[in-house]
């Protein structure tokens, strides 16, 4: 089986896991990224089942995302160009303007408006924007790394406790509605999992194993190596352990769901310079990009590993595992 066939099969399994079939016309890159967007929306507390959604944008990715949202249970999904008439200005003004696609197709307009913004080398859909409009900005990998650090800083800046910050995040992301207690609790738990399991994963040869071992020593957590066949057994029982997920775990949606439901997961990426076109290792870069969307859809953060496991482990500990639980000292 070729790498492309393996990649396609994994995509199909993930689509099936979320309750639908991938549209035949969608190219693999769009299919993969759309699945990542859908998983990201789900993880961030968006509940689109039974909701009307209008995607402000066109193209193969918009079509792939629409198909994914329909498979995920949205009551109706329309796609169209963005303009001033279709974008609500505030959370209380969710509406479709007369004559636009959303209003004509879905009476009363859409419950959610998703605006797409492009970027080269897409790696992740990032949720931004004011209440009432969800901006999905597709960012380059380097931007993802920087923004993750900024978010960790935001959660602790100004002496704000993470509980208050998490509630504020939920209010901004449950668009146009009052946040339900269960949705608040879900996000709060995700930011306050200091005693739960931590999983480290990455592609073979990129240093994830060495980073996981260093992080295990740093956090004084028992180290557990997990393969595709023993995920459920490994995650059963006590919490507070550190897991190294072998590469094959990403091919099993049920295994990934177990990982997501039991703790936090970080993805160890190779040095970004090795992934640039015209430099580094082209074969390695192609292999990395082929599975990037699948990993980032289920991992909380991505960290660039530049060769020193202790340094990478320290960065993960400082801005991801420790910082969100501490009040910033003046």
Task: List where the protein language model places each region.
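NAD(P)-binding Rossmann-fold cofactor-contacting core
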Residues: 72-94
């Amino acid at each position: 089986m070729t790498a492309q066939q393996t990649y396609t099969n994994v995509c199909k399994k993930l689509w099936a896991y979320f309750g639908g079939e991938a549209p035949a016309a969608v190219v693999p890159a769009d299919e993969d990224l759309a699945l990542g967007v859908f998983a990201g929306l789900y993880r961030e507390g968006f509940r689109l089942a039974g909701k009307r959604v209008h995607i402000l944008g066109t193209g193969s990715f918009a079509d792939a995302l629409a198909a994914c949202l329909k498979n995920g249970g949205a009551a109706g999904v329309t796609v169209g160009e963005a303009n001033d008439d279709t974008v609500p200005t505030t959370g209380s003004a969710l509406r479709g303007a007369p004559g636009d696609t959303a209003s004509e197709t879905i009476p009363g307009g859409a419950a959610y408006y998703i605006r797409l913004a492009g970027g080269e080398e897409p790696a992740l859909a990032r949720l931004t924007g004011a209440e009432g409009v969800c901006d999905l900005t597709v960012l380059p990998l380097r931007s993802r790394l920087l923004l993750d650090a900024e978010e960790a800083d935001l959660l602790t800046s100004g002496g704000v406790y993470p509980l208050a910050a998490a509630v504020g995040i939920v209010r901004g992301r449950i668009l146009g509605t009052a946040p339900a207690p269960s949705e608040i609790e879900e996000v709060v738990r995700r930011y306050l999992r200091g005693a739960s399991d931590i999983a480290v994963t990455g592609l073979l040869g990129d240093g994830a194993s060495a980073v996981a071992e260093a992080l295990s020593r740093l956090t004084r957590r028992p180290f557990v190596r997990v393969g595709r066949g023993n995920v459920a057994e490994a995650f059963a029982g006590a919490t507070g352990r550190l897991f190294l997920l072998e590469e094959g775990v990403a091919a099993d949606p049920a295994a990934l769901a177990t990982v997501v439901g039991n703790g936090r997961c970080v993805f160890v990426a190779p040095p970004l310079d090795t992934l640039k076109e015209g430099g580094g290792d082209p074969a390695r870069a192609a292999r990395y990009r082929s599975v990037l969307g699948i990993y980032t859809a289920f991992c909380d953060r991505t960290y660039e590993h530049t060769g020193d496991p202790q340094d990478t482990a320290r960065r993960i500990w400082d801005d991801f595992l420790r910082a969100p639980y501490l009040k910033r000292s003046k």
